[in-house]
Amino acid sequence: AACAVAERSLPEREVHAAIHDGLLVLLDSLATEDWPTVYIKWELGLLKEIGYGLDLSECAATGAKDDLVWVSPRTGRAVSRAAGEAYRDKLLTLPAFLLTPGGVGGEEEIAAGLKLTGYFLERNLFAPHGASLPAARQRLGERLRAISAV
């Protein structure tokens, strides 16, 4: 899935050392149970590297740095529980592990993380070119969501 996303989102012959290094970390993590967390963080890094990074540092509405639980699909910025409660149905879930250095996601958080990165990859990279997420990435999301539903 990572190779398919990288191939479809990065210009050919353009060097992106951070993406390459992150991919090596991801490949090393495949032998561990935490690889889905590493994968989601890799996708966040890819978005940042190509100019579509999410701002998860503070609430877009209030500037608060605590209790960040959603991301605005319009701005890609974090939203606190207090500021976003009235709009919760329109916001994307922000998995807590993305806010904690070294944090690892549980099954539901992994599903939410894949939905979050998938949304921004689709909207910013693929849809403008009449494309969708690569099939391998779609299958990865479906399989991990199925595991979290069990």
Name these PLM-found stretches.
Residues A1-V150:
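Non-catalytic alpha-helical scaffolds and adjoining flexible linkers that form interface surfaces
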